[in-house]
Amino acid sequence: MGVKNLWDILESCKKKLPLHHLQNKKVCVDLSCWLVQMYSANRSPAFAKDKVYLKNLFHRIRALLALNCTLLFVTDGAIPSLKLATYRRRLGSISHAAKESDQPNSHPSISLRRNKGSEFSCMIKEAKRLGMALGIPCLDGLEEAEAQCASLDLESLCDGCFTSDSDAFLFGARTVYRDVFIGEGGYVICYEMEDIEKTLGFGRNSLISLAVLLGSDYSNGVNGFGPETACRLVKSVGDNLILDQILSNGVKATRKCKGKNSGNKVDDMCPKASSCEVGMTQDSDGQFRDVINAYLEPKCHSPDSEAVQRVCGQHPFLRPQLQKICEEYFDWSPEKTDQYILPKIAERELRRFSDLRSASSALGIKPLLSEIPVPCPVLAIVKQRKVHGNECYEVSWRNIEGLQVSVVPGDLVKSACPEKITEFLEKKGEEKKQKRRARPKKSGQAAVKDVDEQLQELLLGIEADSGGILGATASVCQTLTAAYTVAVEDVVDLSSPSPPLRKLSKSQKKMMAEDVNVAGMNMNKMESESSFSTQSSTSDVDNQLIDLSSPLAGGDNGMKGGRRALADISNVGSHSTETDGGGGGGGGVASVGHGTTIDLSSPSPAIGDRSRVHHDDDDVIHERKARDLRMFLDSIRNELY
């Protein structure tokens, strides 16, 4: 508890600081206060059985370790004799408390040893064991833990005290952290003695006098004094004289002036104290002196004692012991324990390295990263990350057993090893350049040449399998390939079937007996029953690109200059030859006249019962090969357009 109403009096001096304020600081912790805070959050049996209070302590410690905040646990020793009444009252022993209040100094020099077997004492032992595994030493105080913390702070052996007892200032503490909240947006509640002196005008002696007047763990206070009255009295006397005034003349309560004396009051105090006097209390039995001495000369370890020197040194992190403790208390696997604590330990090592570089820079020494005798904990930066909107880096670690990579704040990496960031950004820039480097574009003729080579390879394989039937197909493909090199607007579409063939006229049937050059394609012998030879056509033929996906002009006999015909190579071999009217040879030559349309995608209609011979096997083979060819050409067309 401390001094009654003191936290309210000091409210104007309270500061809410970010958790980062504790970075690189050494702080003493009143362990009893921390455990009481965590245990009071939930008093259910399940809470105590699952040791949730100990888990909360673990997570609070790991958050502070990541900031390189060095902690020192301090526990209570024996109960001071002046505090026995308060202690028994807290335990609910009213009768003992009443007797103790009647005779406050009946045993002034005897302290009461604490019950080491109580539930709370067992909680303290568990916390001390957990702290030792995390590298946090513990100092067992002679009496009050807050008095020992204040003594270390007063001697500059630490940067502050964690305690919720307001009487830490009375023992000499300069900086007191009352509460701490971890996590995103974490902060700490801080009180500075310097602020109290400047803002309120209260020094250490003034605060001790407030304890005498208002009451504390050591006394019940003086009747008639409230916070406002006590503060007015202390301010009116001054910090240097207030204790002597209390010891020599006692204290008397006063009230605000009313009536005829109100016009002469100074700072709400009546200059004629006798006229406004409420009560007078003399220190006849030395009660005030005992309380004052308890605060001015507390029983605690001296700064140069062996116990203090032992805990002020460095203590290692004991990973195997921590894994065992967490498995025993929390039922955690070693891997889960490592997942919680190792990233924080690594971050602490990086902060220590950053602090080393900052100290060197302050001395005017700015060595390169490779010249520092202590190796940098960061091996390399893996990638950039964003955590709660803050810039962070995922880094790989050097010499951190059990930890490969973790995420650390970006500002920490910048202060500890900016060279690693430069190295990472340069590497990232090179990777982007390689990705942006475009492949050299091939010229149009080179692209067509590649297409032609692929077509030739495919058609050679097809010709080897199907013989002379696909010779004509190869000629078609060569014609199409040549067409790609000519800048024309016509498009070759092999994906749509040709329209149905019209019925052949007698003149067309007669013309089939002649040898004709069909679309510039030589049709060699396709089957043993029929053969075709190529001759130059006497008619003029237009060298135009042929659209295989749309029907050609009507193939009437009067067609001028007729276009190059498309041959349906799937049925050419099945036409029987017609004998020439003037010839008496054995095997006539079947030929195709001008303007005749021969479909590549569908079987040709019957030219005549006498001239058609079905070869089912050849049709199946050709259809399959033609389909493959169309699919390949379609893929090339999609790539080009």
UniProtKB/Swiss-Prot annotation:
The record's region (N-domain) falls at 1-90
Region (XPG-N domain): which ranges? Answer: 2-97
**One GO-annotated biological process of the protein:** DNA repair
List keywords of the entry alphabetically: DNA damage, DNA repair, Endonuclease, Hydrolase, Magnesium, Metal-binding, Nuclease, Nucleus
The tissues where this chain's protein is expressed are given as:
Highly expressed in shoot apical meristem (SAM) and young leaves. Expressed in roots, flag leaf and panicles.
Q: Name one GO cellular component term.
A: nucleus
Checking CDD domains in the record gives: H3TH_XPG-like, PIN_GEN1
Cofactor(s) recorded for this entry are: Mg(2+)
Q: Which family does it belong to?
A: Belongs to the XPG/RAD2 endonuclease family. GEN subfamily.
Its recorded name reads Single-strand DNA endonuclease 1
Source species of the chain: Oryza sativa subsp. japonica (Rice)
